[in-house]
A protein has these predicted regions:
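Short, small-residue alpha-helix embedded
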Residues: 71-72, 129-160
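N-terminal loops that bind phosphate or other acidic moieties
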Residues: 53, 114-115, 140, 147-148, ...
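Feature representing long, continuous alpha-helical segments
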Residues: 87-90, 118, 137-138, 151, ...
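Glycine-rich phosphate/dinucleotide-binding loop and adjoining beta-alpha-beta core of small-molecule
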Residues: 15-122
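Short, charged, surface-exposed loops that flank catalytic or proteolytic processing sites
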Residues: 78-85, 147-155, 173-177
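Charged C-terminal helix
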Residues: 163-195
Length: 195
């Protein structure tokens, strides 16, 4: 899992499963990878059950939890996370030295430096559906693989993801939009922004 092997990032997400073998796999990747690692969905569930593995790594680590996953990571309730989203994200990112994307309305992006915090204003409730978080994690992985610094990659991915959701909602309605339609709108936005 070394950058010199041509691997530019690793993403562990939905479908990974949570069992003895995948716990071992995630632990080994965190210990050995020199490229950025993105944990989402099952990757986060594994980390929540074995939280110390987050400190035993050498590569940049980015986590993209929703409030329920964040509650599992912190050992509290989702209501407690929602009551202080910026504080929870900031504390966790600083304690574990990670870049954290706390998904939800006004997604919070926190870096390991206490001063590194962004609150995103793009996005809408129509994005709260299966596959939307996978699109975000894929965007984040793409930007990280291109060498963008983790906090900047997270902020850019979250902003563009939300903007694509806003454009999709405008064209198809919040009820009619899908992550696939968001991805199509993202392609148009990237072309418009020159990316």
């Amino acid at each position: 899992f070394q950058a010199e092997d041509g691997i530019r990032d690793l993403r562990m997400s939905r479908g990974l499963g949570v069992n003895e073998d995948t716990v071992f796999l995630v632990e080994r990747i965190l210990e050995e990878a020199s490229c950025p690692v993105i944990l989402d969905a099952d990757g986060i569930n594994i980390a929540a059950a074995h939280i110390d593995m987050l400190k035993n790594r050498k590569a940049p680590l980015l986590l993209t939890p929703h409030p329920g996953e964040m509650a599992r990571l912190c050992g509290c309730t989702a209501a407690e996370i929602q009551a202080d989203r910026t504080g929870a994200a900031r504390r966790f990112a600083r304690e574990y030295g990670v870049t954290l994307v706390l998904k939800g309305a006004n997604t919070v992006i926190a870096g390991e430096n206490a001063a590194s915090l962004f609150v995103n204003r793009t996005g809408n409730p129509g994005m709260a559906q299966g596959g939307s978080g996978d699109l975000l994690a894929g965007m984040l992985a793409s930007l990280a693989a291109q060498g963008m610094e983790p906090l900047r990659a997270a902020a850019a991915a979250v902003y563009l993801h939300g903007l694509a959701g806003d454009v999709a909602a405008k064209h198809y309605s919040m009820c009619g939009m899908t992550p696939s339609l968001m991805a199509e709108e993202l392609a148009v936005l990237l072309k418009r922004f020159g990316g």
